[in-house]
Amino acid sequence: MSHHVVEYGQMSFDCFCKICHEKGVAVIVDAASEYDLRTFINHGADVVIYSSHKFLGGPTAGIVAGSSDLIQAGYMQNIGIGRVMKVGKESIFGAIAALQAWKVRDHNAIREKETSALRLWKKIAISFDGVQAEVVDDSTHNPLSRLKISINKEIFKSSAASVATALSSCKIPIIVRDHEIELGYFYLDPCNLADGHAELVSSSLQNVLQNALKKPLPEVDLDKYRNSSIQGYLDWK
């Protein structure tokens, strides 16, 4: 499941599974951080893979669910090529605990807490000329929303990339969703925030935008911005 593909002209998942199964092809879904742990299997997937460290909030590990013969084939890689990538027992027990906690957690209360954070951030963002903010629902239909912050450089005098860079350079870094930063906007994501984190983000956002008003933020080379994480690996001595 990808957040980075076109959102129109796609066949339904049911149809996709039907075509694959008619040709004897198993459907394996990399569901990563999908919220619903049952939908894909219920609609025909043979194997679904979830991260235990994203929405589930567990340690770094993965959960593989589906057809028993394919799961067994995957398990056999414990003595094959997959051995070098195996997780420790701590992560396995942590993933189990995360699943158990997910089953009993109050999802509605968490959703309300996330909505409160979005309102707080939006109030700050729209108080600046040239900055717009709107709450946007998740494009893959997970029950969550994010704050889309759009910056008009002609009015605000600093670009979205410059603001994102400044946020990431705070004493406590604020990392935004910047997949389409070249279009002049980024997203703030309220998922898995601990108590006090929403206020920390709002304070940093306020400070960065306020400082940009006093003096435009340094320009950001978008090519270098896009390659910064890779360049960091290359520059590591």
Where are these regions (language model features)?
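Conserved C-terminal alpha-helix-loop-beta "cap" of PLP-dependent enzymes
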Residues: 125-221
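Structural signal for terminal/edge beta-strands and the immediately following C-terminal loop/tail
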Residues: 213-237
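N-terminal, charge-rich interaction modules
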Residues: 111-128, 142, 233
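Conserved PLP-enzyme active-site core in the AAT-like
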Residues: 1-103, 117, 122-126, 134, ...
